[in-house]
Amino acid sequence: MKSSMNPTHRPLLLRVTILALTCAATLVFAAERPHDIVVYGGTSGGVVAAVQAARSGHSVVLISPTQKLGGLTASGLGMTDTAGYRQIIGGLAREFYQRIGKHYGDPSNWHWGDREGYMKKVASGAARDGMMHNFEPHVAEKVFEEWAAESKITIVRGERLDLRQGVIKEGARITALRMESGRTFPGKIFMDASYEGDLLPGAGVAHTLGRESKETYQERFAGVQPRAGVEHQFRYPADPYIKPGDASSGLLPEIHAATPAAMGSEGSADKLIQAYNFRLCLTDVPENRIPIQRPDGYDPARYELLGRYFKAGFAHPFGLHDAMPNRKTDLNNFGPFSVDYLRGNDGYVEGDYATRDRIIAEHIRYQKGLLYFFLTDERVPTEIRQQLAQWGYAKDEFADNGHWPWQIYVREARRMISDYVMTEHHILGPQIAPDSIGLGCYPLDCHNVQRFVNAEGYALVEGGIFASQHSPYPISYRSIVPRRAECENLLVPWSLSASHVAFLSIRMEPVFMVLSQSAATAASLALQNHCPVQDIAYDQLRDQLAKQNQVLDFKPDRPKPQPIALASLDGIVVDDLDVTFTDDWVCRHDGRFVGQSFRSDVSHGKADKTFRYRAILSKPGTYEVRYAYTNIRGAEKSAPITLYTGQGPKVIRIDLTQPPPIDGLWVSLGKFDFATQEATVVVSNAGTTGTVVTDAVQFLPIAP
């Protein structure tokens, strides 16, 4: 049959048809049914929040930008950080780890390795409370998927928030979230469970990125930290220049600042955050191992600094052992040049998805290339190359992603600024949040941020912090809700209101799960009472959390010891951060000490190690010299201390098993005449069998 339509009308009809189809598609997307609670982020916390919301009888939708559930917990982070305080993990977080324990309690789930030996050595706590904190990624993912299915949660996978216009508001309330695809999800209460805090900008909620200055919250670990990168610092001199010794030749790759001053003054604010990486799941089981291969685009030049560091004497790049069941390991950063990609995350948090994808791809190239460098560069000690050659990617993990984890380790991103800000003072004391919704327990743990060249012309790392909190601490409900004027129906359990320093401890996955369950319970109360999330009664929330077996309080056996501020001490004091030393001296915080830390020599076994304090005295003359140390178990009875006064060395031996006699902190080495203004004290562990401990040296002038 011949058409009677005028051909000139066909383009118009085509346009009308396309418009109609587009409108129809929009209507389909707009037809998503409303939910009581909308959770954005398929992370561990996102799943927990959705499960709790469903158990409370509410309709809930969990929107996951990825196809997978569980975030980092299901993507390689198989060694859970609890700092030894298993008892503070309650509620659904405890249930998660007990489900893991139940899985590994079945002998049929052990295919390689010594199950009984592993359980005694690594997972002995499971016999007491049923929890296992070390697990394979696919097992964690299985638990999350089973949880979601049992709770009949509506899950939307592979939908990413429209970063520009995705948060739809009316006044101070969010009404819906719109995805890149156009799909729109209306709801009553919303929760940001993403690692990036992606709802905060669109919701008009105040937030920050980077490190505050020391002055902002009066935090001693805040801001640029050129002296605090003590845990994974360069221990041997590594030349940073393309042509060794020639600064004019330029910096090697992976070095970011030519001088300390280029980073900013100590304690100043910046927009940088700790490094990201992928937590790799490796195995040494031949039949389950995929060998590490040369990656596409491999460039050994980007690892030249690492090669020079090995040549200088470095010999401990990582610790490979079967820390997870079935002879697998969770490979994390170890040392100043390792799997952490320093400054690789610049631009990630506030970038669009194309930028993020590019940065993620570069992290993969960096880490794959690094492993290949470890295997093949002749400067890497033979025993290390041979050790790594026994390991490879686990064949039964991440099979749909090239056996590579699908979630990059976003250790830190946006942080909300609300009416209550968690700070260093909540973690280290003396402040205590009165409206606890869960406990944190991990030390302040900041991975390195950047590398720089020191005044002597050698490479160092900056930003690394590891400071013990001594005991668990409460986290405030007000820290997970925005200011009322900004948004009345949003809860933020991950990108919560915390300083950079406080977040270093709070950021652990078990805590994320705990806070997310508490957030979902708060959302339930806000729905029941028809009120903003800021107005729920804390007593009512606390009662509900107690019924869910959440742990909200912890009474330590003894008060937290407070560090002694350098500014409070008389005379000239040289702290452990102001020294040069050989090999690794462990940075510690478990006791009373001067400044930010103290050190002990036990790390990679007994070896001759020295710790050298240098002081510039106000003038030559007589000084009393005092030595600070923390009294610990297993200390050395005769630690050799050598004092250089300009008149020859003087060796003094100290019994470190005895409590320090002066203020419980110091022992006097004696009174000495110094011929010049230069004074040196060298601590050694040569010939010792106990642990050598050192903290600070004090020079007190004696009046003539």
Positions of the model-derived regions?
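N-terminal Rossmann-fold NAD(P) dinucleotide-binding loop
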Residues: 46
